């Protein structure tokens, strides 16, 4: 390896969206973080880390699907939870309206609520199982502490200088696997747009945003402006030679 650059993951995610200034909203398996940037530099007062992420959603589904028999190391259960998350879960635009819709729906009327386990057994999913990603917008409903992801993004922007807030609100970049749930980016946009009106809010959501760190790093690797920040093998040997 001729040279290496240790970089901020959230900064790389920002670059993958083609931005230098904006707010990165990153939610993966173990962490949910919000970080504003201006001209590629992090605005520390707006940095936020939330206490829930994708693993909490998985645990919720494990417990609700398998109850006292749940075992996160059971391959059958792992496959069931992963498939449910990918194929059935989504973010509603309004939780109350969605629950009212399900309440008035006859049993078996919506085939999307049905799921076949790996052994072929048919299971009828409950509304809250399908709406589990609501966790990121209403954590208290699921017994989790702290502000919602959208509120954290609002607070992050509000913590920055007033002159930067309109620019930050109009350049929000969600990334990480949890942001891929259907309805996620639309819900985030609607909440931001409502909060910051009449400032225009915009959400930059690329289709490969679960790989945003890698994509941004690939961009940086080809920029000559960053060459001075790389640590070469010769410099490493000179500085850290035992």
Language-model segments: which ranges?
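C-terminal region/appendage detector
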Residues: 1-242
């Amino acid at each position: 390896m001729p040279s290496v650059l240790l970089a901020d993951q959230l900064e790389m995610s920002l670059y993958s969206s083609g931005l230098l200034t904006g707010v990165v909203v990153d939610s993966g398996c173990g962490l949910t973080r919000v970080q504003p940037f201006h001209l590629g530099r992090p605005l520390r007062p707006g940095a936020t880390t939330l206490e829930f992420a994708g693993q909490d959603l998985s645990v919720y589904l494990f417990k609700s699907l398998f109850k006292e028999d749940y075992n996160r190391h059971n391959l059958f259960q792992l496959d069931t939870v992963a498939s449910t998350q990918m194929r059935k879960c989504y973010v509603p635009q309004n939780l109350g309206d969605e629950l009212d819709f399900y309440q008035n729906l006859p049993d078996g009327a919506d085939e999307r609520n049905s799921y076949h386990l790996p052994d072929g057994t048919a299971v009828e999913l409950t509304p809250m199982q399908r709406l589990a990603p609501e966790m990121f917008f209403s954590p208290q409903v699921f017994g989790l502490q702290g502000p919602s992801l959208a509120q954290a993004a609002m607070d992050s922007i509000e913590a920055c200088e007033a002159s930067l807030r309109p620019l930050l609100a109009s350049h929000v970049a969600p990334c990480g696997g949890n942001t891929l749930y259907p309805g996620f980016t639309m819900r985030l946009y609607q909440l931001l747009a409502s909060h910051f009106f009449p400032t225009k809010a915009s959400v930059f959501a690329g289709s490969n945003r679960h790989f945003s760190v890698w994509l941004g790093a690939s961009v940086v690797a080809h920029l000559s402006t960053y060459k001075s920040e790389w640590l070469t093998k010769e410099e490493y040997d000179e500085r850290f030679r035992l």
